[in-house]
């Protein structure tokens, strides 16, 4: 599963990147990579440590309290949190994702389960910081 972060004014940003110095382009790369790493960490933290006020059930003699609808998924086996990956895909690009099919079902809901969002709230939280990092990296060429 992966979500894309769309930036309004992308054409202007791309034009600024083409004009930017090598140092500014490197700084943008650092901003992108740092933000992606931080985003991954926040998603994992939400899954591992978020509130769990849903149903309690026992499986294999071990009891687990699930998350309630609207809460981040409550970690059970650790498989979901462990599946969250960060990859640098280029000098100024990165992805954060999960290869688990049920990651999307938990985030957005499915026919059997209400949404348990962790990704969207994490993206919403980090977006202002990401924009500030890009502005700082590009300096006056971004304005």
Role assignments for model-derived ranges:
Residues 1-143:
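Short, Lys/Arg-rich flexible segments
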